[in-house]
Amino acid sequence: MKANIHPEYHKIKVVMTDGTEYETFSTWGTEGQVMNLDIDSKSHPAWTGGNQQLMDRGGRLSKFNKRFGGLGL
């Protein structure tokens, strides 16, 4: 393997949608940074089997529905 080509691997804190926190190692962010999840295995319909409403962060879902909601598929 070549030296000095791999990203830094450090410990971060992950906060799930229900507030559960855990620490893991990642190349994301910097040492000690917190990653807040918008959706995870406890809230995603693919894993819960439900038909839950998705959280609209940043208005993206609203913008999509406004643009394509009238198609009636």
Swiss-Prot record:
GO terms for biological process, alphabetical: translation
Keyword Acetylation: no
Taxonomy, superkingdom: Bacteria
Family annotation (SUPFAM superfamilies): L28p-like (SSF143800)
rRNA-binding is among the record's keywords: yes
Entry keywords, A to Z: Ribonucleoprotein, Ribosomal protein, RNA-binding, rRNA-binding
GO CC list: ribonucleoprotein complex; ribosome
GO molecular function list: rRNA binding; structural constituent of ribosome
A UniProt-annotated Pfam family: Ribosomal_L31
Chain segments annotated as transmembrane: none
HAMAP family, A to Z: Ribosomal_bL31_1
Family according to the record: Belongs to the bacterial ribosomal protein bL31 family. Type A subfamily.
Function, as annotated: Binds the 23S rRNA.
Complexes and interactors: Part of the 50S ribosomal subunit.
Protein name per the record: Large ribosomal subunit protein bL31
